[in-house]
């Protein structure tokens, strides 16, 4: 039984001057998305020839849950709600094939600067391990400026960082931490250049150290001196002369530690 051989689908180049092509039809929006410099660009790696994701993962902040929203600190609740609404508007524009609404980022930026300004000058009665991260993220967002964003990829990422800043306020009780794991890890590693994000139990670690230091202020100097002594003996280097009364000096790899 003979089968009709379908005609090959028409193909168009992805970007002028490149041999790669895609089929017309349902994939046409992806061609628009992947066009470098287009407002519909959804993949930050298009410049290097990475595959376009089609926008499926953009604007995750538009799907926040009521349970998560009420768990946020009251100081950020209004801004988090606005970010959720702006993300939904931008996602709707993406579905309609329109570029990112130009008014969204200037509005989000203005609201964030007001909120972060109050946060930055407010006293911190108790140290929280997420505070340095919040300040780093906040300063980065402030430095971006209020100019409208040209691509959906960049707008989605900025709104995600805004939501991440809010969620750092309940860093150890956030129910949507998985939303930040991939993108915000890249943020710390690439955009700020400060390495991997701290482990979730970092606060417990530092609290324990502070408690130990408070109970015995000489504990860590004694341990440091002992560690330096053992390290020096392990290298079979000559030990330094006994220090003068009232002070202790340990030489380690051409450096001196005074206690």
UniProtKB/Swiss-Prot annotation:
Pfam families: Gene66. Induction: Expressed late in the infection cycle. It is found in: Virion tegument; Host nucleus matrix. The keyword Metal-binding applies. Phosphorylated. The keyword Ribosomal protein does not apply. GO terms for cellular component: host cell nuclear matrix; viral tegument. Keywords: Host nucleus, Late protein, Metal-binding, Virion, Virion tegument, Zinc, Zinc-finger. A zinc finger (unnamed) spans 162-174. It comes from the Viruses. Belongs to the herpesviridae US10 family. This is Virion protein US10 homolog. It comes from Equine herpesvirus 4 (strain 1942).
């Amino acid at each position: 039984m003979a089968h009709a051989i379908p005609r090959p689908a028409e193909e168009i180049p992805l970007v002028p001057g490149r041999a790669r092509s895609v089929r017309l039809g349902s994939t046409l929006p992806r061609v628009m998305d992947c066009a470098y410099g287009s407002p519909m660009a959804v993949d930050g790696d298009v410049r290097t020839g990475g595959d376009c994701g089609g926008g499926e993962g953009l604007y995750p902040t538009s799907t926040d849950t009521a349970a998560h929203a009420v768990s946020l600190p009251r100081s950020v609740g209004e801004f988090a709600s606005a970010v959720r609404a702006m993300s939904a508007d931008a996602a709707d524009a993406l579905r309609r094939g329109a570029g990112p609404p130009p008014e969204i980022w200037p509005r989000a930026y203005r609201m964030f600067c007001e909120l972060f300004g109050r946060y930055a000058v407010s006293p911190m009665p108790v140290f929280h391990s997420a505070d340095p991260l919040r300040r780093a993220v906040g300063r980065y967002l402030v430095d971006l400026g209020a100019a409208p964003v040209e691509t959906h990829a960049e707008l989605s990422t900025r709104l995600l960082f805004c939501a991440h800043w809010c969620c750092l306020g309940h860093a150890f009780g956030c129910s949507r931490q998985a939303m930040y794991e991939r993108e915000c890890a890249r943020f710390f590693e690439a955009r700020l250049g400060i390495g991997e994000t701290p482990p979730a139990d970092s606060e417990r670690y530092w609290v324990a150290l502070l408690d130990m230091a408070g109970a015995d202020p000489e504990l860590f100097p004694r341990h440091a001196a002992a560690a330096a002594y053992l390290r020096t003996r392990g290298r079979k280097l000559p030990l330094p002369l006994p220090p003068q009364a009232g002070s202790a000096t340990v030489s380690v790899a051409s450096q001196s530690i005074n206690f």
